Each structure stands twice: as structure tokens, then as C-alpha cells.
Design a protein with these regions (language model features):
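Alpha-helical transmembrane segments
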Residues: 50-55, 155-170, 413-420
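Structural signal for alpha-helical transmembrane segments and their membrane-water exit/capping regions
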Residues: 18-36, 59-69, 174, 231-232, ...
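Alpha-helical membrane segments and immediately flanking helix-loop junctions
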Residues: 85-149, 283-299, 306-333, 344
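Core transmembrane alpha-helical segments of multi-pass membrane transporters/permeases
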Residues: 14-27, 43-68, 220-232, 244-270
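Transmembrane helical segments that form the transport core of multi-pass membrane transport proteins
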Residues: 68-70, 242-318
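Intrinsically disordered, low-complexity non-transmembrane regions of multi-pass membrane transporters
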Residues: 1-12, 178-247, 370-406, 431-438
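Alpha-helical transmembrane segments of multi-pass small-molecule/ion transporters
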Residues: 129-132, 138-225, 264, 324, ...
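C-terminal transmembrane helix pair
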Residues: 108, 121-124, 138-139, 167-168, ...
Length: 438
């Protein structure tokens, strides 16, 4: 969608506000070119040294797994968990796992791919994007924990709180704003229909042992049928698929980098002209995640309040991340009318994360001094560039990229473990439903 169509499709008030804001931003850049240039370099450094290498593999992986039919097969296994707790199709589970391991907007990108493949509806895509909106785990551990706070263990604490509070906020959000409505339907694959036909045939349910073996075969056949149908609908060879995934992933990351650079300049100019003589601590966190967490880490707050506010900022994600998700969904032809729901889930995420951190940080900090020492000793060589500086500007690019990529195998294993845990929870949910529904 082009900028001209965006402005033409908006109301007159919105057009005036956007045009006025753009004009004021241009004037401020012309008046203060050096500050704008330094801010753009700061945003570019964060994007190029952290976001790009950490997110590119997950964007490519999610698209390739969708094309190969993995998401369809996974949806069969995650169906009970997603439908029971999140009121979503099982195929949405991959988007949540990718968002947790890859960071935003990888989850929204996966949700848009699922909607384009007609695995979920447009409204469900917006809800899945809200459920899969997480900060990049490498950024939380390396940048916030190691570089900003000089405590890698604090980064792991923030990561766990970030994930747990995100799931809690999603479960609360889907119940405050239900997914199902007269305009929303759950997409059922041909494998699901085949399974329903088998289950509804009384002639095939002759004995308990035969029923158990039939259910096992039907589950496997349902997964294989879903994956085969997806591969046939896609029809691309591996070479073309690889080229398409690289092109689309880089395009998404370029959009992300553009937003980060613009907001870095915007925050710097607001600091110069709006709050020149005040301490800049809180309001950058409302606009951009990375700059906001940096300003918070430099503030003279008590440790418990600092960690709680950092957890809340990670849950909110910043206005920049909301615009990134909106752009990803709109580029896929999806309506962005659910962005109010998205913002509500982000506020819930921030509130839950703040509360959990406020309750758990003191016990964690009291009994984890040995854990901090272990982390700093075993990870000192790999994290030395981060522990010695509080800003990414001026750091050796090769050292940063090496540190990020050294964590990618762990992130890949983490993705596999997340899927395993989600499948196990789905199995427990299925057993619980059958056990207590009799």
C-alpha cells in the first residue's frame, strides 16, 4: 500500500495531523542536522547490529515452515491448547512461538502469512499478532541485561517475566474481547473434516482397542494430509521458495529499520525542543523500546522499581512497534481495525509484567547473587564488548554480530523447546477436556 493511497484513504483530520507532523519533523531536522544525524546513526546501529542478524533467520524459517506445511501439521497438535486457552486455531501456535523467539514483528509477519494462506481469518490474524508480540530474547539478555544493567541474570529474569506475562495478558485479552463473532469463523482444514467424518462413523468404533488405534492413525493421517495439502497449494520449488523468503524477510526488516531510525530522530528532537532541561527517563519508553530501555537503565531508580518498569516497557513495546505491526498487517491486505485490541493487550502485558516483577524481583535478587557471579564468569569472554559499554554506538560490529550469532543455536533450541512445551500442554489440555467432560 503506497503513501498516496494511505493518505487518500484516511480522514481529513488525520491527513492534516500527519502532514503537519511531517512538516515539523523536517523543519526540526533542518534546524538541528547534527543531532538528527547522530540520532539516526544510533537507531541504525541498534537495527544493524542486533535486530537484523537476530530476526532474519526466524522470519525466513517461519515462511519456509508455512510453505512446507509444517504449520498445518502443527495446528493439529496445538489445537486443544490454542482453542481452550487462547480461543484460536491450532495453527496460530507457530506464530506465538516464532514471536517469542524472534521478536516483533516476526510474530505479526507469521500471522499475516497464515491469513494470506487462508489458515486463519483476517480478524484472527490481528489477535494472533497481539498474542505473538514479544521483544527479541537476544536483545533482552545481551543489550538490556548485559550492556545496560551489567547483570546478565537480570536479563534472563526479564525474559521469563516477559514471556509469562505475555501469555497471561493474551488469555485475559481474548476473554475481555472474544474472538468469535458473526463475522469471524474458525478455518477448518480438509484434514479436520476428514477426522470429523471418521469420528462420526459408528461402524468404525467397534471396540476400545480399535478406537484407540484408530485415533492414533487418524491423528497422524490428519497431520500428513494437512501438510500435503499445504505443499500442493504452495507449489514452489526449494530454490524459488528460498529466494522469496529472503526477499520478503529483508523487506520486512528494512521497514523495521526505517521505523527505528525515524523514531530515534524523533526522540532526540523532542529532547532538544520539548524537554531540554528535564531528565529524560520515562516518555521515550512510550515511543521506542530500545531507546526507552536505555534511558530507564540510566535513571537513578531503586532496583526493584527499575526492573519492574523495564518489564512494563518490554510488555508495552513502544508506539514504534505498534506502527510496525500495523504496517505488516496492512501490507498483507489485512484491515488494521483490531489495533485498538492490540494496544489493549499491550497495556495488559505491561501491567501484568510490572506486577510480576514487583513481586518476584526482591526474592530473586536476594537468592541469586551466586547466579549472577556464575553468569558473569562463564559468559564474560563472549559478552565482554557489552559489559564494557552502555551504548552500541562505536562498538565493533563484528564482535556484536558474533555475539548475536553465537546465541542463535540456543535460540533455535529454545524454539524447539517452546514448541515441545506447547505440544505437551496441548496434550494435557486434550486429556483434561476428555477426562472432565464425561
Amino acid at each position: 500500500m503506497t503513501m498516496q493511497s494511505e493518505i487518500a484513504g484516511s480522514g481529513p483530520l488525520r491527513t492534516v495531523l500527519l502532514s503537519t507532523g511531517a512538516l515539523l519533523l523536517v523543519v526540526a531536522v533542518v534546524v538541528s542536522p547534527k543531532d538528527a544525524f547522530d540520532a539516526s546513526i544510533q537507531g541504525l546501529d541498534i537495527w544493524w547490529k542486533i535486530i537484523f542478524p537476530a530476526m532474519l533467520p526466524f522470519l525466513m524459517l517461519s515462511q519456509m515452515l508455512t510453505a512446507f506445511g509444517f504449520t498445518h501439521a502443527l495446528g493439529v497438535l496445538l489445537g486443544p491448547l490454542m482453542q481452550r486457552w487462547f480461543r484460536l486455531p491450532g495453527k496460530a501456535g507457530l506464530a506465538i512461538a516464532v514471536g517469542m523467539c524472534g521478536g516483533f514483528p516476526a510474530g505479526a509477519d507469521t500471522a499475516s502469512r497464515l491469513a494470506q494462506d487462508q489458515q486463519i481469518t483476517a480478524k484472527q490474524a490481528g489477535i494472533v499478532a497481539a498474542a505473538a508480540h514479544f521483544a527479541n530474547p537476544l536483545m533482552i539478555i545481551l543489550v538490556i541485561g548485559a550492556a545496560f544493567l551489567h547483570q546478565p541474570a537480570a536479563g534472563y529474569f526479564l525474559l521469563i517475566v516477559h514471556w509469562v506475562s505475555g501469555w497471561i495478558a493474551t488469555m485475559i485479552g481474548v476473554r475481555l474481547l472474544p474472538v468469535k463473532s458473526k463475522n469471524t469463523r474458525i478455518v477448518i482444514s480438509s484434514a479436520d473434516l476428514e477426522s470429523n467424518k471418521v469420528a462420526s462413523d459408528p461402524k468404525k468404533l467397534t471396540s476400545a482397542s480399535h478406537t484407540a488405534s484408530l485415533k492414533k492413525r487418524s491423528l497422524w493421517s490428519q497431520m500428513m494430509l494437512a501438510a500435503r495439502d499445504a505443499q500442493e497449494r504452495d507449489g514452489r520449488g526449494f530454490g524459488k521458495l528460498l529466494g522469496d523468503t529472503v526477499s520478503q524477510a529483508v523487506q520486512t526488516l528494512m521497514m523495521t529499520g526505517g521505523y527505528m531510525i525515524v523514531f530515534a530522530v524523533f526522540v532526540r528532537l523532542l529532547t532538544l525542543y520539548i524537554t531540554p532541561d528535564t531528565s529524560v527517563t520515562f516518555w521515550p519508553s512510550l515511543l521506542e523500546l530500545h531507546l526507552g530501555t536505555y534511558h530507564l537503565s540510566q535513571s537513578p531508580l531503586t532496583p526493584v522499581l527499575l526492573i519492574s518498569l523495564l518489564a512494563a516497557v518490554l510488555g508495552w513495546g513502544g508506539l514504534c512497534s505498534l506502527l510496525q505491526v500495523s504496517a505488516v498487517l496492512k501490507s498483507a491486505g489485512l484491515a488494521t481495525t483490531s489495533m485498538l485490541y492490540f494496544a489493549g493487550v499491550r497495556l495488559l502485558h505491561a501491567l501484568v509484567a510490572f506486577s510480576i516483577s514487583l513481586l518476584l524481583w526482591l526474592p530473586f535478587s536476594r537468592y541469586s547473587s551466586e547466579v549472577w557471579t556464575t553468569f558473569q564468569t562463564t559468559s564474560g569472554n563472549r559478552l565482554a564488548p557489552f559489559l564494557n559499554k552502555q551504548s552500541l554506538v562505536g562498538m565493533n560490529t563484528s564482535d556484536i554480530i558474533e555475539a548475536v550469532w553465537s546465541g542463535f543455536p540456543a535460540a533455535g533450541v529454545g524454539l524447539a523447546l517452546l514448541l515441545t512445551v506447547m505440544i505437551s500442554l496441548s496434550g494435557l489440555t486434550f486429556w483434561f477436556n476428555r477426562r472432565f467432560s464425561r
